[in-house]
Amino acid sequence: MTRYTISRRTFFQQAAVGVCAAGIGKYAVGAPAKRPLNVLFICVDDLRPQLNCYGNRFMHTPNLDRLAGKGFVFDNHFASVPTCGASRCSLLTGMRPRTEQALTNEAFDALPREDTGKPGSLPELFRRNGYTTVSVGKVSHNPAGRRYAKPTARTDAAGRMVRSGPDDHEPELPNAWDRVYGPTGPWSDPWSAFFGYATGKTRSYTDAKTPAWEAAEVPDTGYPDGLTAEAAIQELNMLREGPFFLAVGFYKPHLPFCAPREYWEMYERAAIPLPDHSNPPENVDRSLSLHRNGELTGNYVALKSPEKATEEEMRL
């Protein structure tokens, strides 16, 4: 395994060299005549560097450790913006988030829809140079990579859940993909699959008691990420002649924490070390967490007043 700490300038210099080495047509300088390389781009939602290859020995991450052992492990990586959609938009387009909308989860909605004739994103660059580009799962912000109205916590006069946002089902990243989709299995739509529980259930935006985790006795394909992995394998088989740019986005470990029981049973909960706080506030019990984050408090548990988290909840 190679530990790699580089500056931002060095990263972009070497990324430019890598694009040229891949030989992607007219945008490559001195492109070699050999067969261009294929690209498998994997993104994982809300994954921290809490992996065995980053020194967390209690973590069971053999496949990621194997991948790290064959490549580079970055120790000095920073997101350009903390918001999920804005960060993905900045990464895929190379644009610095400077406007108000570019700092939000709706950053992709601000991208120009028309075809300008020039690549506006990384996958579009590959597509314009002869690559087949495919997006499976959550690569941009929306699950399945398309624009559709999202459920909210609001209800109308008839008690129906209100949805918001563009609903034209166009790809969030324009002119970038030959195919863009996300498997839904028993769930009604990609957004329901994103927050899916086993047997097709999904998070309720109007029920504060929706569980924050689940460990059902199901195979990998009993949850959306297993279906995404299966679809990605099928795409690899279909695209084997290349060249291709295949982007695969997994939902977990985004809330709710749902996975087949066999993965939960790999861990002895009492043996999981509690996280340290690098800059804890003074005179506050370390087991007390006060925040206004609706992901955990508003949508999954109802706290009427500040309470101490149990050790089990902290390990979760």
List the predicted regions and their residue ranges.
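Formylglycine-dependent sulfatase
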Residues: 2-316
